[in-house]
């Protein structure tokens, strides 16, 4: 059996097990990860590279930074301030999505989610609303906000690099032509109808995320220092390019400072790390690597696009590229999906004599629609434990958002980015 066939079988297995959830998501990920090594598809180093991925380091760091915000009671304090202004659950959802969406446009969407997850859990605790109903809109807004600027998500820069090789480019805010209407439509959806689809779980955490602790004995300096370090970490992430320090390192410095200064103990810091998230993310990265290395991902893309024939309608091609990227991104990382599809889309556009910017915009926006699974993008994975989510929660809440993004994109793309200008 060829490596690509084995990879596709593992992909099918993962999808089935993620949907059924007969065994924990993290265990399924590890079965796939180890299975790819045992079958010889990947070597050990490649299969387990996901566990030293920069996003895993960012996860661990921000779990500790978030843990400190809880341990000191500062998350509850912030939650109290926000809930004074947002009186209803729907107002809270709108406020969270607007703040996260805008921040995600200039920050990494993963970084934005990592910083604000503990704050939102604090808001949930203070307001009495269930965190499972607030965290999912947060990560969806982070994904949508990534399409507001050139630096909002890695996939945006991948497409830009490909265009620069043929002396073309996207403007800094050009993605927002499609991205901003999608963000507005998404917020309106969850404010009116979509909030009914959000999961309604009672989640009780232990350790650093226990929001019902008595914080009266916590020194005030610890509360403020936890917030100051969070803000400094956030600023370091915003100015990542200027200071030359990667997101994960900024997070690591913040986490270390909190432990060294005694704001959070080593024991509580370790307790705040959600290992379920680490195993789920690290394990599924091996599947993404196998899809790329064996050519299985390219095979899927090639078969679908090849079925359209030699001279497909530009509108049909835009739709197919968008949907294909939207499907792939929910099982591979959104960055890997864009990296896989950009060269394929570019060659098709050039073969048709079409404007490559139109096809690549569809590719990037479709590749950002990682709403329907917990593994589509790192932020989705980060809230699995905190929100008590199951695989089908993402499908139920996120799939309508893919439909909305598709409809909005199919209206705007042919107008703003015509194939034959």
Where are these regions (language model features)?
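Membrane-embedded alpha-helical segments and adjacent helix-loop junctions characteristic
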Residues: 13, 27, 32-34, 38-130, ...
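Transmembrane alpha-helix interface/packing and boundary motifs in multi-pass membrane proteins
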Residues: 14-23, 99-108, 140-151, 236-242, ...
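Juxtamembrane and boundary regions of transmembrane helices in multi-pass small-molecule transporters
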Residues: 6, 91, 127-140, 146-158, ...
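Generic hydrophobic alpha-helical scaffold/packing signal
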Residues: 145, 232, 257-258, 267-270, ...
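Hydrophobic transmembrane alpha-helices of multi-pass small-molecule transporters
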Residues: 1-60, 64, 177-302, 318, ...
